[in-house]
């Protein structure tokens, strides 16, 4: 399923369930402990999963040159919708030709290819403990040995996978278009549990304090215990969403196909604020980055929006020439984002002014990974780019 089809598919399914799908359900929930600083950002030398950390904040502690240069470009042959992971100076990314590839971070040379057998869409790899995990468009989860690209196990869901895996200890979390979030044993691929929703699980779950959080096409915000697969609570997400949730200090930030960005307090389960551009009414498919009291998100209105995390008031917007499905990343007071206009942008986090840009000439709808002073992103023309 292409990105452009997601809105129509969600709308069709949501319309059949909107009147009955959501009945608020919740179990008593103790107040959550504050997140540790390391949970809110990726380390300087790794970006091990989509958005860099369990909390999906899209923030890295690395330092990147003010005017980076193209270090290398690896030709993948087909569009990259998958976003890279970076671990131990190796880049892992899925391809539309159905491969998970490993490429050297410093030299851009291919280390190995794993053939999944079916195209890989937006599912982005997660890497931990010598294993790389990814989902494909026929609904198979793949586990691969990072040393040589040899298969370890596969697990079949009932529909395509656009969500990205999250590894927490010995558990792999994966959402599927069959409407379930799965908990799998990372070593064996055995199903530990399946949490069922009433529509697609498109976004990647963020995990804080042993609880997975995600909003989806059923217009419900879900919180699930990752050990048991039991629901902690479910509350209205107000609209269907293709974005993943970023979670900071017990507040979830995410965009919706109702043209809004929301801040949802998980303690009270109330919406703290809603942001909608006063003039441009377009959906948000991009996932938000959250850092230093600022929420940064790309919109299908062609704009990058920076919002006050407490109030939802716009701090600045920057207009590109095409829609933005790429999820921005942040490091060192800079915002890094691709646009379907073919440019990669670096903006000042405080002002929104362009610090640097690269004209690739092909849409950049995948999201960047930041590690070891480098930026890696794939284009729709099949080039995997590394800037340093």
What is the role of each PLM region?
Residues 42-70:
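Blade/loop signatures of beta-propeller domains
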Residues 54, 66, 72-85, 110-128, ...:
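Extracytoplasmic beta-rich repeat domains
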């Amino acid at each position: 399923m292409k990105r452009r089809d997601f809105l129509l598919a969600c709308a069709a399914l949501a319309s059949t369930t909107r009147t009955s799908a959501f009945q608020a359900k919740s179990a008593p929930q103790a107040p959550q402990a504050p997140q540790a600083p390391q949970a809110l950002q990726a380390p300087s030398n790794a970006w091990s999963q989509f958005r860099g950390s369990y909390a999906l904040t899209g923030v890295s502690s690395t330092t990147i040159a003010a005017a980076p240069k193209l270090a290398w470009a690896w030709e993948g042959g087909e569009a990259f919708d998958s976003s890279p992971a970076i671990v131990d100076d190796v880049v892992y990314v899925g391809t539309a030709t159905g491969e998970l590839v490993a490429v050297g971070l410093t030299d851009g040379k291919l280390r190995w290819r794993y053939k999944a057998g079916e195209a890989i869409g937006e599912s982005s790899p997660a890497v931990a403990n010598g294993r790389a995990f990814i989902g494909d468009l026929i609904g198979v989860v793949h586990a691969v040995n990072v040393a040589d690209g040899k298969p370890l196990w596969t697990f079949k869901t009932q529909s395509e996978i656009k969500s990205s895996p999250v590894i927490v200890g010995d558990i792999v979390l994966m959402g599927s278009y069959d409407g379930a979030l799965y908990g799998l044993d990372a070593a064996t691929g055995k199903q530990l549990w399946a949490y069922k929703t009433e529509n697609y699980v498109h976004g990647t779950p963020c995990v804080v304090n042993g609880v997975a959080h995600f909003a989806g096409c059923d217009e419900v915000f879900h919180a699930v215990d990752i050990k048991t697969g039991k629901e902690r609570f479910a509350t209205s997400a107000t609209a269907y969403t293709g974005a993943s949730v970023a979670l900071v200090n017990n507040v979830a930030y995410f965009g919706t196909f109702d043209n809004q960005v929301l801040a949802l307090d998980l303690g009270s389960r109330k919406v703290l604020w809603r942001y909608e551009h006063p003039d441009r009414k377009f959906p948000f498919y991009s996932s938000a980055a959250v850092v230093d009291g600022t929420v940064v998100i790309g919109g299908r209105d062609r704009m990058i929006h920076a919002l006050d995390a407490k109030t939802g008031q716009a701090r600045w917007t920057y207009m590109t020439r095409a829609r933005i499905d790429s999820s921005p990343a942040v490091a060192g007071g800079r915002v890094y984002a691709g646009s379907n206009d073919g440019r990669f942008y670096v903006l000042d986090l405080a002002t929104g002014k362009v610090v640097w840009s690269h004209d690739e000439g092909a849409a950049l709808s995948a999201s960047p990974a930041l590690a070891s002073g480098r930026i890696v992103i794939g284009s729709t023309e099949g080039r995997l780019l590394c800037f340093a």
